[in-house]
Amino acid sequence: MLMKSIIYWSALLSSTLIVTQCTNYQKTTQKDDILRERDLAYKDSFSASAYYEDLYNSAEMKYAFKGTTPEEVDVWQTEFRDKLKERLGISQLERQLASFKIKARKINSEDIGYAIRERWEIWTEPTVPLPFVLLLPKNKEGNLPLMITPHGHGKNTETYAGIYLSEQERIEGEIGERNVAVQAVQNGFIAIAPTSRGFGKTRTSEDKAKDVPYSCRTLLMQDLLVGRTPIGDRVWDISKLIDWALAELPVDKSNIIVSGNSGGGTTTLFAGACDTRISMSIPSSYFCTFTGSIGTMYHCDCNYVPGILEYGEMSDIAGLTAPRFFCTLNGKDDAMFPLKEAQKAFVNLKKIYTAAGVPDNCELYIGNGGHRYYKEGAWNFINKHLLK
């Protein structure tokens, strides 16, 4: 009996030391390597770019990853993910809506030849009926992979589902390969193309009346008053769509992919970081550094999370996806999310995946173009890693 007790307490002490060492390792390296003092020398004149660069260089980045082992990845992710969800406002939604039951309503259904196309609304909050298009492959049996395709900035919220407002829009959509949900259903996936919060029917009444394509600024301002963010709202919507799909559709829960372009790439990256049910994240024309993209040039207000650099860079947030699959699609001529900055961020992301023991589970695809979707990179990655 005494021997069993000694063995038990020895094992417990050993495991406690491992966790403590991992946690202390994070705290020590982050404190020593990340915290930086600001340059206190007086400057003769004001330069906005120099001022912001100084702020970015002195950002705390308390959750910037510095580990080297899978155990350190686990400890870091557990703490960072909770903090990120709190900062985005997702934790608040989880607390306030703990007993809320999502509801969905089918609006119409039609056979479009290659698929069944249905329009739905889903109540992701009591006051938020969110429109989405559901594409179902025909003549498929058993559980199927699911792809959710959040869109970016534009007037039409149904482009990804292959629904266009004009012939010119159709041409531009096909050139930019924006029919992401159509690509998915044609490859045997169940596809959901949701309206992004702040667009379409979820705009303000004033913006609808003036035909303003989106209400992102208003959404951000109102969210900030209650500790929420548009990114958090949109990630919440993705999670509620997953809840509904798993309950109502023949979905293979081991193959849930999220992929969108630009603002849809933002939602994709953050959703993969926050919701571990997502097995693969493929953001297009978004993955970069915060400082080299939204911190350097004009971007829509919905891109911003207060104090995000207190936590880390975009590569750290993407690292919360590890060891699950992650592929970023970037255009070599994208001026909004410059390739040079994306490559810099990817070096850091690769270190996280290497520490997690799965360096091949993340890829950077460089497309020969600008700010658009790159289906070749997406589907090469999917076909390589889709769990059969």
Q: Which residues fall in each region the model found?
A:
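N-terminal targeting or regulatory segments adjacent to alpha/beta-hydrolase or S9 domains
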Residues: C22-I116, T124
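Glycine-rich active-site/cofactor-binding loop and its immediate structural neighborhood
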Residues: I107-S166
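Mobile cap/lid helix-loop segments that gate and shape the active-site cleft of serine hydrolases
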Residues: T218, L224-L225, K240, I278-A318, ...
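C-terminal catalytic histidine-bearing segment of alpha/beta-hydrolase fold enzymes
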Residues: V347-K388
